[in-house]
Amino acid sequence: MPLVDSPAIDLDIKEWMLGPSTNISNELGKPILIKVFQVNCPGCFTHGIPEVLEIRAKFIDSPLLIWGLATAFEDFHLNNLDNLKKLIDSGEVVGETLAVLSAKGLLNNNRLDYSIPFPVALDNVVPYNPSDYLSEAQNFIKKDFPQFDSFPVKNQKLISDQVMTYLKQKKFEAKTFETYQLKGTPSTLLIDNKGILRGKWFGSDYGLEKEVEKLLSL
């Protein structure tokens, strides 16, 4: 797992859907903002991507590169290549994204009223077949429950059992999502012009504009 202020690891990409094929190590000298999203993720389209569109408009004359990374850690029947193609080609959305954005009046004929204007890649989603479920569970708990050791024994057992059940039902994993140990979508990665990971966040509304300004000042 790359830590903040350490070298960023290249994205493990299945396919570039929009824009030229590239990667972090190919773009040294340029700062990069990567918005990680899922097709079936309403918050990605009510907050995550609109936030990046605002950043793009504000910093259009800067050297900042902006990429989208479509990943999948759930709902694999919706978060897939076919639905990403629909999104890229026509703005068509599906699943909970369709339901929520329709209810908010944000769609036109089940489509976004804008096109995504930056390169988008598909995370490499592969079958999940760990050799050691116990080790996987311990790593999962360490990532998502940093105060685990301070919990009562009863709570520790409950969490451990739930995590193990989840992992044994898990069929696929998204390589970049797992490598960066992201907690959900939308998430954001900021990488400086020397290829150093300078920020990693889950969610929106955490002052991304100021973080980008700091990145560009390095």
Regions found by a protein language model. Name each.
Residues 1, 106-108, 174-178:
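Short, P/G- and charge-enriched loop/turn segments at secondary-structure junctions
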Residues 1-25, 157, 161-164:
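N-terminal "domain-start" segment that seeds a small globular fold
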Residues 9, 42-43, 50, 119, ...:
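Proline-centered helix-kink/hinge sites
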Residues 22-53, 65-69:
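Short active-site neighborhood of thiol/selenol oxidoreductases, capturing the structured segment around
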Residues 28-30, 61, 182, 191:
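Active-site acidic short loop of glycosyltransferases
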Residues 42, 75, 127-129, 197, ...:
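Flexible, glycine-rich phosphate/dinucleotide-binding loops
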Residues 46-137, 144-151:
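Structural microenvironment flanking redox-active thiols in thiol-disulfide oxidoreductases
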Residues 140-218:
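Thiol-/selenol-based redox modules, centered on thioredoxin-like
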